[in-house]
């Protein structure tokens, strides 16, 4: 299996009992480059074939004939190494639709325990939807930006509510990005699968 988000987590889970070994093969290189550990560095990875498979969509009517970049990580840690350190579980409704289409075990309620198991969410928000002891540290920004606040106030004036935890009970609304960052002394360190698993 590859050493992306799913591969590293699955290898960790399969080998956790100590009876099994798992070989993880990654087509990309090591995750040593400094731009992988700088939040804004992800912008350079989006155009760098050393870190990104450079996939693109096909032109379609829905995109008015445009080709849309679809970045995928080509490095240890996979796309978790090139995602700007952002974290988003996805919409509850998407998982529920998969279950309704016959993929039993894939509803949001079915997978919520697994989300909670791998994360350690550092926040004062409601913890009933969040994990606290997992390997991947998820944190909120510890600062506010005047421009971002004005943007969110504008969205709120249009009826889009502020949501302090879009990975919690409700995914709708506007929020600061949650990030996969660990506090390390006076600096911060990317938390991604090759580090955490």
Residue ranges, per PLM feature:
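N-terminal redox-cofactor-binding region of secreted/periplasmic oxidoreductases
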Residues: 1-193
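N-terminal low-complexity segments that are often proline-rich with Ser/Thr-Pro
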Residues: 195-197
């Amino acid at each position: 299996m590859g050493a992306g988000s799913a591969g590293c987590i699955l290898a960790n889970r399969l080998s956790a009992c100590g009876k099994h070994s798992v070989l993880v093969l990654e087509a990309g290189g090591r995750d040593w480059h400094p731009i992988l550990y700088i939040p804004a560095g992800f912008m350079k990875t989006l155009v760098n074939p050393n870190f990104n498979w450079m996939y693109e969509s096909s032109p379609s009517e829905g995109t008015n004939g445009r080709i849309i970049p679809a970045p995928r990580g080509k490095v240890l840690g996979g796309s978790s190494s090139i995602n700007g350190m952002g974290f988003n579980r996805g919409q509850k409704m998407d998982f529920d639709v998969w279950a309704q289409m016959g993929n039993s075990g894939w509803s949001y309620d079915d997978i919520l325990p697994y989300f909670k198991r791998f994360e350690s969410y550092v926040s004062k928000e409601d913890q009933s939807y969040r994990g606290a002891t997992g390997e991947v540290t998820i944190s909120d920004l510890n600062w506010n930006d005047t421009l971002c606040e004005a943007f969110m106030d504008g969205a709120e004036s249009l009826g889009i509510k502020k949501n302090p935890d879009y990975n919690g009970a409700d995914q709708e609304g506007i929020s600061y990005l949650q990030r996969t960052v660990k506090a390390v002394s006076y600096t911060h360190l990317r938390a991604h699968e090759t580090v955490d698993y």
